[in-house]
Curated annotation (Swiss-Prot):
Subunit description: Heterotetramer that consists of two anti-parallel arranged heterodimers, each one formed by a 20 kDa (Caspase-1 subunit p20) and a 10 kDa (Caspase-1 subunit p10) subunit. May be a component of the inflammasome, a protein complex which also includes PYCARD, CARD8 and NLRP2 and whose function would be the activation of pro-inflammatory caspases. Component of the AIM2 PANoptosome complex, a multiprotein complex that drives inflammatory cell death (PANoptosis). Both the p10 and p20 subunits interact with MEFV. Interacts with CARD17P/INCA and CARD18.
Descriptive protein name: Caspase-1
Signal sequence region: none
Annotated source species: Canis lupus familiaris (Dog)
Enzyme class: hydrolase
Similarity comment text for this entry: Belongs to the peptidase C14A family.
Major subcellular location class: cytoplasm
Modified residues (Phosphoserine): S302
Post-translation changes: The two subunits are derived from the precursor sequence by an autocatalytic mechanism. Ubiquitinated via 'Lys-11'-linked polyubiquitination. Deubiquitinated by USP8.
Superkingdom of source: Eukaryota
EC identifiers of the protein: 3.4.22.36
Its job: Thiol protease involved in a variety of inflammatory processes by proteolytically cleaving other proteins, such as the precursors of the inflammatory cytokines interleukin-1 beta (IL1B) and interleukin 18 (IL18) as well as the pyroptosis inducer Gasdermin-D (GSDMD), into active mature peptides.
UniProt GO cellular component terms: AIM2 inflammasome complex; IPAF inflammasome complex; NLRP1 inflammasome complex; NLRP3 inflammasome complex; plasma membrane
Amino acid sequence: MADKVLKDKRRLFVRSVDMGTINGLLDELFEKRVLNHEEMERVRCAHSTVMDQARVLIDSVLRKGPNACQIFISNICNEDIHLAQTLGLSSGSPSGNDHTKLDSQVEVPSLPAFVENMPGPTIPDSEESTDTLKLCPPETFVKMYKEKAEEIYPIKERKDRTRLALIICNIEFDHLSTRDGAELDIAGMESLLEGLGYSVVVKRKLTAKGMESVLREFAARPEHKSSDSTFLVLMSHGILNGICGTAHSVENPDVLAYDTIFQIFNNRHCLNLKDKPKVIIIQACRGENPGELWVSDSPKASTDSWTHQPLMLQSDAIHKVHVEKDFIAFCSSTPHNVSWRHITKGSLFIAQLITCFQKYSWCCHLEGVFRKVQQSFEKPDVKAQMPTIERVSMTRYFYLFPGH
């Protein structure tokens, strides 16, 4: 019975589910009248941590019996494939009524022609090395394309699309310290984005005016018209409201405001990317505060390969009065705080970002991958920082479907 299966998976569910999946499950369960409005709000509002919300959610469903549990299991399988695999769940064969409801409410667009005869990769075992990009099997791609047709950004066929990505990385500066280890960030991000199907443009050693010029040239590229998305990766020293050019000093600021980036790529100035995901990743400090770094109630040796002596870590912070700005981006730290970079291994944020894309982008949408990165920084230690998702204006889920 579904209730027995779900009860056996309770502890693992509480430990594994993330906030995005909880919100998706709540919406589905409310729509299907498994939970009423009061029960849904009790989960969302009465408990502050993800694990607390997960406990209340699964216990509320268990109390409602086998049918409610089966609906819950089916929604997990549809909402979060990675979580379903972690829990060892399968939705089984949906009833005819479910198919009728889906087909009558959603007009599913025809699948891209290349899907029908596409040979697909196998899913790597969970214990395999995660230093390569896991590919999305055709059956998973087809399933998600059908079931989430109205919820996801469409992707273009590989043979016709011209995806572009831009990496800007400043390493050496006229007045600021050299960002040792940043070359590894460039190499890692370039390899990742190429694996995701993007042609990557890399620019180094630019002033703020130079960065703005490169961004405007990139936004004007005609290839964006036949693309379905773009990535912008900016890595440099930074302050709260912008990223530093190579000529920056306290006396003579050389800063590209983050807001300028969004103006360049908005629908008024970049029509070729209208209605397409524009992902901005920023590796830079946003202040000087080190947060909880080096603070511990009971210091002990760590087996984490990132744990090194303090002198091996550098900060990308510089001195400036902070002015709050909002932007849509995945930033390497919270406002007013530093981001850490190892002088021989590269930036901690970029390394975790690459790992999570390699491991989860085959089954998770973009914000789900970003949350996996955040979870890897959840417990402050020698590398204390908290990546932050900001200025989100996406109206659909963005799945990268690596391999397609």
